[in-house]
Amino acid sequence: MKIPTKRISTLLFTLFLLSNHFTAISTAADSLGPKTRCFIEVGDPHISTFLQERRGIRAVKVDAESRCNFLQNNVILTVTIYKVGRFSDHFVKEFRTDPANPKSSGFRVKNWQTYRECMNEQETTYYGVAFSEAKINGKLLRTVKARSNKSKPLKCGT
């Protein structure tokens, strides 16, 4: 079957127009500015050896960091600890970094202050959730919530 030359010309012309159209869209999207590579890393719940050795406190702790390839300012990094319940999970503790603190700015901002003292040694499963809000290049940006990877039972009832 032979395709008429007019159809081939029309098809090629249409493809040419579409390729130019998508190139223009791609160029416009690239001109919006550099893309940030920011993310939250949430550590696994653990019994804090630091608190146990230095303060004599037995506590479950979750650490988190906000990392970005651009300078972050006035970061509020919120970390929440939950324990797994039979029918639903329960809030245990939440801590937010102070945006006015000089340590709340930089390429890497840490929140290692979220912990809850153990009341007994009952085996309990915990997990951490974190998100952050920061000023990057003058714009207020928020991350989606991130959850700790592993939840294992700890001998720490709250």
Predicted regions and their residues:
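Bacterial N-terminal signal peptides that target proteins for export
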Residues: 2-12
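Mature extracytoplasmic or otherwise solvent-exposed domains
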Residues: 26-158
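Bacterial N-terminal signal peptides
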Residues: 11-20
